[in-house]
Design a protein with these regions (language model features):
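Short coil turns that delineate tetratricopeptide repeat
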Residues: 61, 120, 154-157, 204-207, ...
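Alpha-helical adaptor scaffolds
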Residues: 88, 92-118, 182-189, 207-274
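Residue-level recognition of tetratricopeptide repeat
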Residues: 72, 97-101, 131, 216, ...
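Canonical tetratricopeptide repeat
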Residues: 98, 128, 161-165, 213, ...
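Terminal, low-structured helical/coil segments at or just beyond the last alpha-helical repeat
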Residues: 158-197, 201, 296-328
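Start-of-helix register in tetratricopeptide repeats
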Residues: 65, 94, 124, 157-161, ...
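Register position in tetratricopeptide repeats
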Residues: 76, 101, 105, 135-136, ...
Length: 328
């Protein structure tokens, strides 16, 4: 569970994994773990270890969410039996998925298949069914389950994660829009659940910048479709605002069809030739696709426009990490 929606994180820490993956992928190196190597050769053996568990509880702080977080932490630390004991006491769908994987491989796949039959439109279930199928060397069925997860509930973090496995050459997750203006301090100091509520109210009653801030928060929460709607509304309200127009373009990014975002973002270079946000986010999207050479060019241009701004500093951080992983 995130400590805060807009928590202060070192730019280098935030971008290192993304840039490393992009740089290595551009060099032809497979870097996204086991999911980058597809094989449909039947095998009686399971893959080593156990499938990952990817419960996302957003900003929930209720007792059930805290229990699920504890269980997931135990699972991730290699203590599935203790995790399973906690999951077994949680009647939620998250608890049932966790309990099935904690018992791996003892009937885990069958239990997840039963959950999928009972909840055919649950991205949570389809994602983890795909992971169990993949660990069982049933790769084509795993990909089919991930496609269901991505399509059934596209406005969820589980759909975003499923798309990661379907597109292993892309950086994980989706690019998040970084406004050139700051979130007010009065919002940043609030607990995460209050941040979201305040941002939602401001977006409903305020102007383009309020909608952009809420859209960025929704992106952080794994709700890309809702974020896209907020960004589009901001662009309609303020068509001459480069932040609003760039956000609307970034919100369209889809690993199945990246051209939707690029076709909107690229022309903004001519519309707003001095807007740092356009160059920066063009570089970000290129980096997400492991187009390192082109990304570096755009990030350098963004930094040159003003290295002292938050976006200029982020561009510098990306470029520094690119240098540290051996790209020029």
């Amino acid at each position: 569970m995130a400590a805060a929606i807009f928590a202060k994180v070192s730019p280098r820490a935030r971008v290192f994994a993304l840039v490393t993956l992009a740089a290595l992928a551009a060099s032809g190196v497979v870097v996204i773990g086991v999911f980058a190597t597809r094989s449909d050769v039947p095998s009686p053996k399971l893959r080593p270890g156990r499938p990952p568990l990817a419960l996302d509880l957003g900003v929930r702080t209720d007792a059930g969410a805290r229990a699920l977080e504890r269980a997931q932490t135990l699972y991730n630390r290699g203590r599935p039996r203790q995790a399973g004991e906690i999951f077994a006491r949680q009647p939620s769908l998250e608890g049932q998925v966790g309990a099935a994987l904690a018992a791996w491989p003892d009937r885990s796949l069958a239990r997840l298949q039963a959950l999928a039959a009972g909840h055919p439109r649950s991205a949570l279930v389809a994602l983890h069914l795909g992971l169990a199928l993949y660990w069982s060397h049933r790769d084509a069925e795993a990909a089919a389950a991930w496609r269901i997860a991505a399509a059934a509930q596209p406005d969820t973090p589980y759909a975003v994660r499923a798309s990661d496995f379907l597109h292993p050459r892309f950086a994980p997750g989706l690019p998040v829009f970084s406004p050139s203006f700051s979130t007010p301090l009065r919002i940043r100091v609030l607990p995460p659940e209050r941040q979201v509520a305040v941002l939602a109210h401001a977006a409903a009653t305020g102007g383009a910048h309020a909608k952009i801030l809420y859209g960025a928060a929704l992106q952080h929460l794994g709700r890309p479709r809702s974020a896209e709607a907020q960004f589009a509304a901001a662009a309609r309200l303020a068509p001459d605002d480069p932040d609003a127009r760039a956000a609307a373009a970034v919100g369209l990014f889809d690993k199945d069809d990246p051209s939707r975002a690029f076709s909107r973002l690229g022309p903004l270079i001519r519309t707003f030739p001095h807007a740092q946000t356009v160059r920066f986010h063009l570089g970000l999207l290129l980096l997400w696709m492991a187009q390192v050479k082109q990304a570096r060019t755009e990030l350098r241009l963004a930094r040159a426009q003003n290295p002292a701004t938050p976006l200029g500093k982020q561009a510098s951080a990306y470029l520094a990490v690119l240098r540290s992983v051996g790209t020029r």
